[in-house]
């Protein structure tokens, strides 16, 4: 018996199983080490090759998901082939009674792992029958968890885009959302929407923590970009909290809840792969609100308050840049003044 083949096979199986279980079951820890390295390498490669072209980047997520599954299968399959190859007589042809060749072992390991079943090759002896049973169980586990993981990721991608659409339908930047929320007396019309956005963002944060691959699902449509939506929502909340007189602001608890949800999102994404930008993004222009007759604090007072949350806004810009996006006010024309309602 060749012990080198056994050791190499067990190492491949162990590496694959650790990454597989880490990624699919250990939801608190995100992706496994192999998947994490593959994700970073693939995303950087796509950005470099495409020049941040949205159409090319939109393929990074699906490609990464497929490559992850292929790597898991390859590690498991190769590991079992090496284990069977440690003994030349581990598998026998049922008709000729001859030992299986390398190609036969590859074939046998594949159909046993995918639980297909066949009769032209058979394990030779009790030990190899037990090994075959273990491989079948591992294959069934892999298929079941992989399908569940695939469905969960695709469902999370849809929810991610739904969140972006619900936020960006209110406005393309924070100032526009604040303007649209004014009912002529105060901003309480947006209270319910803040509660809904906080709830959706909380779910999205949990999904990003469980499935870091979501970071690399890039939408070609501005309206479906969750990182843009988070930045726009946070800018709107910044204006509500620091740029609007308190008597006109939305419900304070709703503002606090929404800002807390965004902070949790930032902490989750920051832990994964994001670093703050070197400079803070441009400040929201609240002078447009004043021009529309909406009560707002002085620009100087607002600037002082915004400077106090500089690190938070730098992290937001870092997320935008890492996602191959531009800060919202740079993507949307905001030069035109909003007309009063």
From Swiss-Prot:
Transmembrane segments: 6-26, 63-83, 137-157
Keywords recorded for this protein, A-Z: Cell membrane, Membrane, Transmembrane, Transmembrane helix
Membrane topology, record value: Multi-pass membrane protein
Primary subcellular site in the record, as a coarse category: membrane
GO-annotated cellular components: plasma membrane
One Pfam family it belongs to: Ion_trans_2
Places the protein is found: Cell membrane
Source organism, top-level taxon: Bacteria
Protein name: Uncharacterized membrane protein YdjJ
